[in-house]
Amino acid sequence: MQNNRSLSKSSFFVGALILGKTTILLNATPLSDYFDNQANQLTTLFPLIDTLTNMTPYSHRATLFGVRDDTNQDIVLDHQNSIESWFENFSQDGGALSCKSLAITNTKNQILFLNSFAIKRAGAMYVNGNFDLSENHGSIIFSGNLSFPNASNFADTCTGGAVLCSKNVTISKNQGTAYFINNKAKSSGGAIQAAIINIKDNTGPCLFFNNAAGGTAGGALFANACRIENNSQPIYFLNNQSGLGGAIRVHQECILTKNTGSVIFNNNFAMEADISANHSSGGAIYCISCSIKDNPGIAAFDNNTAARDGGAICTQSLTIQDSGPVYFTNNQGTWGGAIMLRQDGACTLFADQGDIIFYNNRHFKDTFSNHVSVNCTRNVSLTVGASQGHSATFYDPILQRYTIQNSIQKFNPNPEHLGTILFSSAYIPDTSTSRDDFISHFRNHIGLYNGTLALEDRAEWKVYKFDQFGGTLRLGSRAVFSTTDEEQSSSSVGSVININNLAINLPSILGNRVAPKLWIRPTGSSAPYSEDNNPIINLSGPLSLLDDENLDPYDTADLAQPIAEVPLLYLLDVTAKHINTDNFYPEGLNTTQHYGYQGVWSPYWIETITTSDTSSEDTVNTLHRQLYGDWTPTGYKVNPENKGDIALSAFWQSFHNLFATLRYQTQQGQIAPTASGEATRLFVHQNSNNDAKGFHMEATGYSLGTTSNTASNHSFGVNFSQLFSNLYESHSDNSVASHTTTVALQINNPWLQERFSTSASLAYSYSNHHIKASGYSGKIQTEGKCYSTTLGAALSCSLSLQWRSRPLHFTPFIQAIAVRSNQTAFQESGDKARKFSVHKPLYNLTVPLGIQSAWESKFRLPTYWNIELAYQPVLYQQNPEVNVSLESSGSSWLLSGTTLARNAIAFKGRNQIFIFPKLSVFLDYQGSVSSSTTTHYLHAGTTFKF
């Protein structure tokens, strides 16, 4: 059993099987955290997977009675306690059950069909009509059921390893976990075969594991149409196998929609003896049309394999749109590592609500494997887009080598497509010997309409026509953008590339010191090559600089010192000069306003003419023009997105927590020894000013205290409190979550027969802060942790104008409160991470002075009232100052800004009711208002007199 557990879990850790070697997903990959989480989730969601995989019943067992082999009767099993069928062979059709229509609904406990078999069709159940499996509460288990012949003439009809249904199968609204494990059919539908399969509205997870169809149709599911919809828990297809569609084969449309839970296809395999066209294809899914739309949850295809076409999906039409993250990783096929698109098809890939990522997908069209994500056959159109903040990322190339006449392949076609379409070879090993690992080939007309098209880290494009109707073309170090021929004529006549908004990824260039290349690629498939005098590249417009997030790079790269000869662009042209730069303005580098390092770029061209060497593509062209730039820094301008006001807000969070505690202590003088417990709530609103953003803070906590007094009514008190607070910065998504522990001591001394009193308080607090920051429209996320210590002291004097024996008295008072707060240095994690260290701590001296009034009433229950009004000036304040440094650029600045107004009005109110002579309940409120800050502090609790 332990070996089986390791086997099932390993499918999430293991990458593609490449040339007999296993690639393990390590931290260096873009999705390693995701796969680690999936591995942990598998055994949590499906605790019975190992038990069922190894279970072998020794005797027949069934809780089904009556006629179970009549295709003319309808069977309804509703509100059963449980349903079990073990090791049955009741009929040639349906080893455990055969009927006209079947409904299994509202079962309280387990549904189990285990190790039944049929010698013709449907290992467990055959349904001539519809099968409804809905609203069941316990586990649903179909395991080890077989549809295998005992004579060769039955082989082609052995379909539906567990279930065969002539019409529709609906699996819906089930709360329990569904297991379809180790079911097998000689022909098709390893687990389920039906006309239409609907898996929808389930709140329990579902697993199709290790099912197989020996023929050409659907290792787990085979149907005319399949719809997986609105499931709130994950659905897994793991280790299923068939000749076509390792997990699912559908004659028409396969739809994944509105699923908030993940839909995972992992380690499925399509292979049969015939490895020709229309065989051994679709490692996970084989269908005419595949749609992944409106899924908030993740859809992932990992480590699926097809011996022929489409390591993950083989289809004619594919649409991915309005969905959360969609991942294609470690898949492989002979053609189309992840996706194979059949003739006259269409592919739409829109990263609207989450990223679409292709990583480490391979195909084996020749002796050696190459990285390929999508392979388009003849007359297949391609549309790709990404919305703001998202990306369609291809770490493996796309192949569209067949020309579509009079059609533009649209990239970022819609106005909302302001995101990034990224082609990157960042994860291709430097040891790769095949240039095809890096090249995306488009023998068509590509149009960029919005957003950003980016080529990075050695990625290459070969494109017949390219037009920039909008958006930005971003090129990084060692990227190549080149011409190619048309498929039908095998000629480059008419090949034109028009680029009018070019951006260079400056941090990438500074890291490798190699410029991206625009190239009139030579003709010829092998040596000797020759210059191609047909294509034209028109480069126009201003040149700009960006970083990986399409932001100004002046806070991403270290530009504090002058830099000479920065390689910006390399034009590899033919002798006749077919790259036109007459309307290209590199001087545009100095026209944009930006934050970060300020300075001046001095761009210049260097032109070199060489002798043609026809033995290599790279040495054929003779005209080399290289654009360089010299950088001269002039200063630094802090970007408000990076400024870091949120770190100062943590100081004020600690200050307000302790200041409110010290102000509250003046009300705590008790004549008799007491113990109290209370709930507390604190609200603070700090206005923004020209120097810093404001914030609002909410804190909830509790307090425990006790007081003791002497015969002369001198009292001593101690208080322990904890506050859990959240601070939210104004006009941003930055926040601070804190946990504060405070200990306070108080001494009260009455004098002159209690008409004059003095008190002193001392408080210390310790706070843990978790700071989260978000910037650049959510593109950048950082977080950090630190702690702070705050020390405060208060002295107060009051004079009662009337004796305490009177029902009403007034008491003028004056109080001095001093607070010091400091916090530790810390470093954020994430993109554009910063380091923070304290330059100056916070000091504050406030002197409230005002008047209190107290009275009591004894209607039914003794009740005491106390109100206070005070003027609250700040006599001394040292605002905190923090040194901030930005790791990505090496820049630093001093942060200071938020301040309290010098004058405020404070007010308090207290109501205490004695339910019993020694037990009272109370409600306190105190607040303050100034031009900068508003505070509200609430207490509700009980006091017991000893």
Curated annotation (Swiss-Prot):
Autotransporter domain location: 668-946
Major subcellular site: secreted
Domain of life: Bacteria
Keyword Secreted attributed: yes
InterPro entries: Autotransporte_beta (IPR005546), Autotransporte_beta_dom_sf (IPR036709), Polymorphic_membr_middle (IPR011427), POMP_repeat (IPR003368)
SMART domains in the cross-refs: Autotransporter
Name by which UniProt lists this protein: Probable outer membrane protein pmp18
Organism (species): Chlamydia pneumoniae
